[in-house]
């Protein structure tokens, strides 16, 4: 399984390297669309694992200090949020690239902690120093997410 995962990750790495990235008209990230897709996704099995890589916090002044230029100071209207991801048992690995995301990741951590009694999920914040670190982190943590989900399945088996 690790060889298949490594091959898939290497293919995705090539695809990511070919993406041309452009900016919006503010510094804050519009993460709501990604969270909404994760919540709506038809997961094939009980292992639900999402990776967030961002160099800026989510829209909304509560997720960062007021120094950032922000088009949505109240947050993105009518958006799914991180709480729905935690409630659905979607594990989240946050890749920290800059300290600008500290406030946001602390809020996410507190939200996930509220749901750990209901459903065990994996929430981690990991700083990386080079793009090569990302592949190893994904392999290691996707295995952890699978183990967490298996624990949930075993816990919920009828006795």
Question: Where are the regions that the model predicts?
Answer:
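Divalent cation-coordinating acidic motifs and surrounding scaffolds
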Residues: 1-159
């Amino acid at each position: 399984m690790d060889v298949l995962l490594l091959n898939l990750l290497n293919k995705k790495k090539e695809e990511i390297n070919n993406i041309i990235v452009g900016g919006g008209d503010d510094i804050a990230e519009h993460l709501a669309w990604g969270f909404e897709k994760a919540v709506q996704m038809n997961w094939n099995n009980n292992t639900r694992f999402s990776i967030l890589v961002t160099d800026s916090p989510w829209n909304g002044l509560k997720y960062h200090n007021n120094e950032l230029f922000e088009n949505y100071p109240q947050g993105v209207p009518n958006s799914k949020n991180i709480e729905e991801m935690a409630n659905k048992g979607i594990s989240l690995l946050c890749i920290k690239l800059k300290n600008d995301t500290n406030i946001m990741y602390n809020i996410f951590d507190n939200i996930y902690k509220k749901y750990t009694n209901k459903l065990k999920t994996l929430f981690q914040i990991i700083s990386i120093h080079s793009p090569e670190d990302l592949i190893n982190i994904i392999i290691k943590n996707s295995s952890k997410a699978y183990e967490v989900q298996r624990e949930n399945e075993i816990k919920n088996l009828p006795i």
